[in-house]
């Protein structure tokens, strides 16, 4: 389950990075 959540977080991060520049 943790692996699935990690993949989801990675996917969300990639989606967000494509739509907007990271603030960090």
From Swiss-Prot:
Localization annotation: Cytoplasm; Nucleus
One GO process term, biological-process aspect: response to unfolded protein
Predominant location: cytoplasm
MF terms in GO: ATP binding
Tissue: Expressed at high levels in testis and at much lower levels in brain. In testis, expressed mainly in germ cells. Widespread in brain with highest expression in cerebellum and medulla oblongata. Also expressed in renal medulla of water-restricted animals.
Name of the protein in its database record: Heat shock 70 kDa protein 4L
Function: Possesses chaperone activity in vitro where it inhibits aggregation of citrate synthase.
Induction and repression of expression: By heat shock.
Subunit structure: Homodimer. In the testis, forms a complex with p53 at 32.5 degrees Celsius which is scrotal temperature but not at 37 or 42 degrees Celsius.
Signal peptide span: none
Iron-sulfur is among the record's keywords: no
GO CC annotation: cytoplasm; cytosol; nucleus
Family per similarity comment: Belongs to the heat shock protein 70 family.
Keyword terms, alphabetized: ATP-binding, Chaperone, Cytoplasm, Nucleotide-binding, Nucleus, Phosphoprotein, Stress response
Residue numbers carrying Phosphothreonine: 19
Gene: Hspa4l
């Amino acid at each position: 389950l943790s692996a699935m959540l990690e993949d989801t977080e990675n996917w969300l991060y990639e989606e967000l990075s494509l739509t907007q520049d990271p603030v960090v």
